[in-house]
Amino acid sequence: LLISIAIIGIITGIVLTKYGGFDSSVLLKSLAYEIALSLREAQIKSVSVVRNGNDPDNSFDYPYGITFDPAPANQKKYTAFRFASTDVTEVPTFGNGTSPAEPLETFTIGRTMIISDVCVTDAGGEDCSIDRLDISFRRPECTSLFYGAGYGSPADMADIESAKILISSSLGGDTFVVEDARNLKSLGGN
């Protein structure tokens, strides 16, 4: 009986020790899927919105997107927005003071996870020095439009080939969501 109790105690100790890592990896992967689905929802709103017969401001053609900000004050949330302009020469952005973007919904990241970094990739490689990342979609194109605050001029945004959102957990581990210009999403992690 004493040996059985010792074996059960050892197994219980091992399970409880490994639970934090298991819980962290499951929650990170779940959040990565949630972010990917939020991006897909923004794309669907951009290209599949039904035109209202009475649409004086032409809002049918407004781009929709998601903004990610790894600054400490904002790293526990991300925001869906609508860019209230049909000017195709404007890069849809959120929160730069002059932007006609309207916040639609703010998603709060729970528990122990944060958006720890955002990166963009161009022909020169990956750049993680940007302050904020906006990924949006404009009718009739299905391709992703990127804006990296601190990346360069609005004309430089066309050079961005993909974007990465890095998600970290205080319990250990990280994962990421990558969106490329052809609107392909991929998830990964350590």
Task: Kindly give the residue locations of the regions a language model identified.
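Terminal alpha-helical segments
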Residues: 25, 37, 51, 80-83, ...
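Low-complexity, S/T/G/P-rich flexible repeat/linker segments used as non-globular hinges
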Residues: 167-190
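N-terminal single-pass transmembrane signal-anchor helix
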Residues: 1-20
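Membrane-proximal N-terminal amphipathic helix
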Residues: 21-56
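Type IV pilin-like appendage domain
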Residues: 58-136
